[in-house]
Amino acid sequence: MDAVTVNNFFLIGAVLVGMSILVSSLSSRLGIPILVIFLAVGMIAGNDGVGGIVFDNYPMAYLVGNLALAVILLDGGLRTRVSSFRVALWPALSLATLGVLVTTGLTGIAAAWLFDLHWMEGLLIGAIVGSTDAAAVFSLLGGKGLNERVTATLEIESGSNDPMAVFLTVTLIEMLASGQTGLSWGFVLHLLQQFGLGALLGLGGGWLLLQLINRMHLAGGLYPLLVISGGLLVFALANAVGGSGILAIYLCGLLLGNRPIRSRHGILHMLDGMAWLAQIGMFLVLGLLVTPHDLWPIALPALALALWMILVARPLSVLIGLIPFRAFHDREKAFIAWVGLRGAVPIILAVFPLMAGLPNAQLFFNVAFFIVLVSLLVQGTSLPWAAKLLRVVVPPDPAPISRAGLEIHPTSEWELFVYHLNKEKWCIGAALRELKMPEGTRIAALFRGTQLLHPSGSTILEADDILCVIGHEHDLPALGKLFSQAPDRGLGARFFGDFVLEGDAQLSAVASLYGLKLDGVDGEQPLGRFIAHEIGGEAVIGDQVEWNGLTWTVAALEGNRIRKVGVKFPEGRAGPGLFL
């Protein structure tokens, strides 16, 4: 490769990445998932597009795809809270295993019939598109305000279901290449090996990396690089010994993100940029790889297969996978079924048959690409609409306009929160001493216009003041009520109900107040405990229960305990204006 070729490579790469970033602003305006924008830029620059770039290097696409996916999963694991596991771990694992099997089987049967393939080739297509995509899910769910049970289930599922899809794909390719026509017990043992070694190396490698980071004294910019290199080492080792590298790097990130770690905010900040670069690079390469005119001959059967998977296979897999978990409302199941987003993983898996030289390998790739495109356009575009229709959106928590970490101690979790005081806030005109600040927080600075003031207890807050507060992440809900822009009160009333009651209120007192019948229910128990029992599992904000003709909604939690409950009356029925 001469100097001119290298320079052209840099030039083309910089133009494509820059274009992807610039046109990504169209995503929110047009309501199109940003990943589709990246994919479209690659296709436009490709063989059939205006760029005319011929790219058919499948091993290179496989390399870029795996590297990008590893970085995205590492970042996703770092941002996943272990606390979300209390409501979603087992349901997500059920969907990641049983759900993928059901989706693979149903999609494979349809694929074999639609494309006149052997049943094992049909199953191979089903396995290739059988898993939801972490990059797509993390990208499209961020900031949507979904309830915790739905968000956690979808994110954990997308981070843990790739091993099953990879395993099924590799196994079926080996069977087709060797002429096998049946399954053996080795199939199950290999699956257990993938999950077992992946989990062991992911958690073990994450723990060792955590100890190394907290004991090393490095320049601040080197810690994120150490995390990335360590995560990739875990990924590669797990693959080398027959485990799941995808699961391993996700669990490695999960452990690092939920333990005190040196330079946490620097790591998260850089990983955020790297994850975006990985998504852009991966979808650009995959867009360049496809030849759009090859998709037209298979468009109708591929569209039928995509709709079959979206409307039949995915919903049935969710329905079967969530049977043991009664906490899930039908609305939540329907939304989880709809957000079975496919992304880069199926396209990367579709490269496997090409590299193995299987007959019909190009067909498998084109079908997988078409299904991903339909999934992102149909499911991804309709996600906000579906969330509102199925009522899985909860009113957002107020948040600071910015936050930054304070590395006071190697494992310090102190942060600086910046709040802009809007004129609608009740605290305008109040003295600082009147504010009920959370214990352990301090007001560090107050800006008025361009002036830095020295705040004291007698300082009166004015509209458009900027407050800087030092505290911890768990202080954010209380601080938000004091300083942040409050959400529309009408939105809260419409969602949580006409009145909000304390979860500790005695059920018999609530029944007496609202004229309700207990009908054998223990009236001595707290309202929150009764609602939790009716939900049938770990509660999340937004959970709803119908009882005595009223709608009871979980409005606030304290740990696993329901702290506040909203009550909504049917139209035309008034209730007492009291708070218990």
UniProtKB/Swiss-Prot annotation:
InterPro entries: Cation/H_exchanger_TM (IPR006153), FAD-bd_PCMH-like_sf (IPR036318), FAD-bd_PCMH_sub2 (IPR016169), Na+/solute_symporter_sf (IPR038770), NhaP2 (IPR023729), RCK_C (IPR006037), RCK_C_sf (IPR036721), Transptr-assoc_dom (IPR005170)
Sorted UniProt keywords: Antiport, Cell inner membrane, Cell membrane, Ion transport, Membrane, Potassium, Potassium transport, Transmembrane, Transmembrane helix, Transport
Start and end residues of each RCK C-terminal domain: 403-485
PANTHER family noted in UniProt: K(+)_H(+) ANTIPORTER NHAP2, NA(+)/H(+) ANTIPORTER 1
The protein's name in its UniProt record: K(+)/H(+) antiporter NhaP2
GO molecular function: flavin adenine dinucleotide binding; potassium:proton antiporter activity
Organism: Pseudomonas paraeruginosa (strain DSM 24068 / PA7)
Encoding gene per record: nhaP2
SUPFAM superfamilies: FAD-binding/transporter-associated domain-like (SSF56176), TrkA C-terminal domain-like (SSF116726)
Family matches, as Pfam families: CorC_HlyC (PF03471), Na_H_Exchanger (PF00999), TrkA_C (PF02080)
Family designation: Belongs to the monovalent cation:proton antiporter 1 (CPA1) transporter (TC 2.A.36) family. NhaP2 subfamily.
Function of the protein: K(+)/H(+) antiporter that extrudes potassium in exchange for external protons and maintains the internal concentration of potassium under toxic levels.
